[in-house]
């Protein structure tokens, strides 16, 4: 979620919404939370490619009766029958789902209500929360592939945030370090007293940061003399055909927004960006984001080298003792290797040689997820407008990519 300090350090270029709710207030805890999240997700992934085209519940049913595995269509019917009960038991108003097979959108579906009494549709616009970041990253990577900027040039030659003008570490900041969360910034500057600070030498540690994404967005905007959201439109959204996606409020938002749903005792928070935010608040439909994931899976618009770098772990965050524990729980003691860390725009996990790219998003009353397995051409995208949305997302992912351990760590 965006900083609560309007326009701090970005000359008003970035929309700032209400503060995100945190159970841990310190910047250190925020870093550790992000690291543990990355490691925990990667530690338990197991790939089941032969079962990835059917729902898990259909698979279990087939196993117990010794009958043949149902077709995708048969399994999907059973999947549809369960979604409404998942929404009800989790107190989540709606969920939008996309399933990708063979690097193509196999199907999309939307269930529930976008707002009280209004059914969600394929045109419902969901807040992406941090799923905004992969689109921002793809914009920068395509600009780099077109040689309009370099991933390794010093941002300081173009622009320095006023808060860090006197910090010599500011000269070390590059687009690559911003996209891989190695800037040394806190997630949001409100976590460091409302002032942007570099807490360690850039490139030496991983620390999840929305500020880093806004920093590289501001750099691209100044270097290319174009608003960042216009660059994203021209470089990513238009070429892919994402006609229902925007960083900022549009007239066509009217009547189409998925209203966030949180604890009943709390007043709803639903910030609408009036100026671009490279890390949060992008609005889109399930169909548009599914097309985006397919484009990423096909490496469209990128050089081969940059495509490879996007899917390469910059720093392994998995401790040996954690890997041993996860392998024991998964029953894979004899042959089990796990690495995980940030790529460029995505979290990258490699389990027993199989690579998975994924990212999630979390704002007040909003939970989102996108994941894909490049080697298998499989992907799943899920949006919800409920505080408990991850409960539904876990069930959806387990059904479409049937691995209970992976789904349980989301």
Model-based region annotation:
Residues 88-96, 117-177, 198-212, 277-280, ...:
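Short active-site loop at a secondary-structure junction
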Residues 122, 127-131, 143-186, 190, ...:
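Active-site helix/loop module of the DD-peptidase/beta-lactamase fold
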């Amino acid at each position: 979620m965006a900083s609560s300090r309007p326009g701090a350090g970005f000359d008003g270029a970035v929309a700032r919404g209400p503060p995100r709710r945190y159970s841990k207030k310190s910047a250190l805890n925020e870093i550790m939370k992000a690291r543990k999240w990355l490691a925990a997700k990667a530690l338990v992934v197991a790939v089941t490619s032969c079962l990835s085209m059917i729902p898990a519940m259909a698979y279990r049913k087939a196993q117990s009766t010794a009958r043949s595995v149902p077709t995708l269509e048969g399994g999907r019917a059973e999947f549809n029958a369960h979604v409404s009960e998942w929404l009800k038991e989790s107190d989540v108003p709606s969920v939008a789902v996309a399933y990708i097979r063979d690097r193509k959108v196999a199907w999309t579906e939307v269930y529930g209500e976008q707002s009280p009494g209004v059914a969600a549709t394929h045109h419902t616009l969901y807040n992406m929360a941090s799923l905004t970041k992969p689109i921002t990253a793809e914009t920068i990577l395509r600009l780099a592939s077109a040689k309009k900027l370099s991933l390794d040039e010093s941002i300081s030659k173009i622009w320095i945030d006023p808060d860090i003008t006197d910090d010599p570490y500011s000269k070390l900041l590059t687009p690559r370090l911003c996209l891989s969360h190695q800037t040394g910034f806190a997630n949001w500057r409100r976590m460091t007293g409302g002032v942007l600070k570099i807490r360690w030498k850039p490139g030496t540690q991983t620390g999840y940061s929305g500020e880093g994404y806004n920093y590289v967005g501001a750099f691209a905007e100044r270097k290319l003399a174009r608003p960042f959201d216009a660059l994203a439109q021209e470089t990513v959204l238009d070429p892919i055909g994402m006609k229902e996606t925007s960083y900022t409020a549009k007239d066509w938002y009217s009547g189409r927004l998925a209203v966030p749903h949180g604890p009943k005792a709390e007043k709803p928070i639903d910030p609408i960006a009036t100026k671009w935010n490279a890390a949060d608040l992008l609005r889109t439909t399930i169909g548009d984001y599914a097309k985006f994931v397919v484009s990423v899976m096909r490496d469209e618009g990128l050089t081969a080298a940059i495509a490879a770098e996007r899917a390469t772990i910059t720093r392994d965050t998995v401790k040996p003792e954690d890997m041993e524990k996860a392998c024991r729980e998964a029953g894979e003691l004899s042959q089990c290797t796990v690495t995980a860390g940030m790529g460029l725009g995505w979290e990258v996990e490699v389990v027993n040689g199989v690579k998975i790219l994924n990212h999630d998003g979390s704002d007040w009353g909003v939970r989102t997820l996108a994941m894909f397995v490049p080697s298998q051409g499989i992907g799943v995208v899920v949006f919800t407008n409920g505080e408990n949305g991850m409960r539904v997302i876990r069930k959806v992912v387990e059904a479409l990519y049937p691995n209970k351990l992976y789904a349980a760590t989301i």
